[in-house]
């Protein structure tokens, strides 16, 4: 398995994403936003940061980058796509995930570890966690308030697309939502950073199982 780690101007978590992929036992390669092909890749990791300086709004300019059409193609083919923080914002901008990310209710940038609950462990991203398991991931965002209409929220609940919730909601997200998947279950977006939760020495290794779950799910289908 080989992951593409996208790099935009202003990305600052691409190295963490790369290391997370390698730690899970697969290959990874950085891919510049100006590229027009993701041939040879089995999945996509869209890192956090401030793509294009977050001008217009977070993820807006990245959403029209040349590489995005290939991200959509891989998603349509059922390949795993994970967007974290700014990556989640980009996935909502390009329509691969519903909803939007708004300014935190506090209007402050929040940077700290947060306790989260796995509320759906039947996905390609969470199948190594226990249902209801509590995990610790770092958060680092100013626009992490997940918002959606009541209609979309009901669809998310009906389709079991909400996978991760905050225990102590730090940003005002609708129903404490921290992470979701698309209906097919192969595209995932979350504001917390599992790629920064790989070492107990640094405070938490709760993120290890998320990347291992992605690899496990892919191998079950292809090996």
Curated annotation (Swiss-Prot):
The UniProt record lists the keyword Hydrolase: yes
Reactions catalysed according to its record: N(2)-formyl-N(1)-(5-phospho-beta-D-ribosyl)glycinamide + L-glutamine + ATP + H2O = 2-formamido-N(1)-(5-O-phospho-beta-D-ribosyl)acetamidine + L-glutamate + ADP + phosphate + H(+); L-glutamine + H2O = L-glutamate + NH4(+)
Active site residues according to the UniProt entry: 85, 193, 195
Occurrences of domain Glutamine amidotransferase type-1 (ranges): 3-223
GO cellular component annotations of the record: cytoplasm
GO molecular function, one term: glutaminase activity
Pathway(s): Purine metabolism; IMP biosynthesis via de novo pathway; 5-amino-1-(5-phospho-D-ribosyl)imidazole from N(2)-formyl-N(1)-(5-phospho-D-ribosyl)glycinamide: step 1/2
Main location: cytoplasm
Key words of the record: ATP-binding, Cytoplasm, Glutamine amidotransferase, Hydrolase, Ligase, Nucleotide-binding, Purine biosynthesis
Subcellular locations according to the entry: Cytoplasm
GO biological process, any: 'de novo' IMP biosynthetic process
Keyword Nucleotide-binding tagged: yes
EC number(s) given by UniProt: 6.3.5.3, 3.5.1.2
Subunit structure as annotated in this protein's UniProt entry: Part of the FGAM synthase complex composed of 1 PurL, 1 PurQ and 2 PurS subunits.
Function (record text): Part of the phosphoribosylformylglycinamidine synthase complex involved in the purines biosynthetic pathway. Catalyzes the ATP-dependent conversion of formylglycinamide ribonucleotide (FGAR) and glutamine to yield formylglycinamidine ribonucleotide (FGAM) and glutamate. The FGAM synthase complex is composed of three subunits. PurQ produces an ammonia molecule by converting glutamine to glutamate. PurL transfers the ammonia molecule to FGAR to form FGAM in an ATP-dependent manner.
Protein name listed in UniProt: Phosphoribosylformylglycinamidine synthase subunit PurQ
Organismal lineage: Bacteria, Bacillati, Bacillota, Bacilli, Bacillales
């Amino acid at each position: 398995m080989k992951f593409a780690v996208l790099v935009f101007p202003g990305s600052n978590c691409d190295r963490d994403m790369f290391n997370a992929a390698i730690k899970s036992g697969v290959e990874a390669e950085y891919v510049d936003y100006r590229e027009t092909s993701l041939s040879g890749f089995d999945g996509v990791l869209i890192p956090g940061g401030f793509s294009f300086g977050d001008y217009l709004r977070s993820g807006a300019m990245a959403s029209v980058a040349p590489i995005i059409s290939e991200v959509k193609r891989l998603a349509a083919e059922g390949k795993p796509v994970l967007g974290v923080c700014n990556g989640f914002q980009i996935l909502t901008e390009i329509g691969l995930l519903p909803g939007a990310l708004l300014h935190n209710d506090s209007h402050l940038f929040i940077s700290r570890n947060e306790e989260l609950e796995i509320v759906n462990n039947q996905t390609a991203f969470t199948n190594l966690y226990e249902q209801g398991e509590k995990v610790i991931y770092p958060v680092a965002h100013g626009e992490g308030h997940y918002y959606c209409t009541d209609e979309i929220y009901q669809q998310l609940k009906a389709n079991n697309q909400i996978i991760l919730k905050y225990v102590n909601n730090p940003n005002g997200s609708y129903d404490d939502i921290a992470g979701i998947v698309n209906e097919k279950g192969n595209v995932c977006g979350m504001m917390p950073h599992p790629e920064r939760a790989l070492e107990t020495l640094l405070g938490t290794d709760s993120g290890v199982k998320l990347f291992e779950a992605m690899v496990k799910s892919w191998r079950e289908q292809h090996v």
